Amino acid sequence: MIELSHVTKTFGSATRALDDLTLTVPQGAVYGLVGSNGAGKTTAIRHITGIFRQDSGSVTIGGLPVYENPAVKSRIGYIPDDLGVFGGGTLRELAAFYRTMYPRFDAKRYAALRDVFRLDEATPLRRFSKGMQKHAAFWLTLSLRPDYLVLDEPVDGLDPVMRRQIWSLALEDVAGYGTTVLVSSHNLRELEDICDHVGIMHMGHMLLERSLSDLQDNFVKVQLVTENPLPQSLQILHESTLGRVQTLILRGDPQTVADELAASAPMLCDLLPLSLEEIFIYELGGTGYDVKNLVL
């Protein structure tokens, strides 16, 4: 389990990147970390991987502190958004380095993945395209057989075939080895396909986190036609009207919403599920984030 408890991090004298952040990734989960630009997602990830030390609060993996703990760090596979950390080495040189640094490096898996990624192992990574560098990063990281796979915008710039191949490999590790995955991405539709838990961050703190199924069961889109007032008990996040048809985004489980709307005797009442992208937009809209005029 990955746990951040009441974590605060300030850079300089005024910039508070994390503000009492609490985040929990259950063991064996595929957790999608999403948020507005500048929400603090990458800063949170750099605490999880032991790069940053928190000002206050705690950061633990498996109940153990991460910062300056090589035993815990050796169980983490991390792919950052910026791959400049690879420098000018070749894949072959980096694989040899990983073997010395990570006791769990699996040479057989590294060899097996050669047919998946098909990269020249004698070419310096700086000569690879951005997409090829991502391929190399996944090749090396998946060869670690990590207990915890932490990914920051991992498939940005990859073609659809390779994206699907990489997610398939990662999910095989989740199913076969109990790997815990945390992935930060702005591609919410893709996250919806692979994640079972979601956390939404804004301005350094967590707005909400829960399983994806629970999250989607607590928001509903309604299209209705009624001549009667709507019940005051409805928790309306957004509403719009086109002709006689009202479209409402509501917080609440579908059955409760349907029962409440029945009191207004609607002539038409269709309840529709919300996508993760829609939930993200309307949840942030409630914080004052400038998304109030977006309608999906």
Where are the language model's segments positioned?
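Helix-to-loop junction immediately C-terminal to a conserved catalytic motif
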Residues: T49
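Short, charged/small-residue-rich alpha-helical element at the C-terminal edge
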Residues: V220-L296
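Conserved ABC transporter NBD signature motif
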Residues: G57-V72
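ABC-family P-loop ATPase nucleotide-binding domains
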Residues: P80-A136
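ABC transporter nucleotide-binding domain
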Residues: I166-P254
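Catalytic Walker B motif of ABC-type/P-loop ATPase nucleotide-binding domains
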Residues: L149-E153
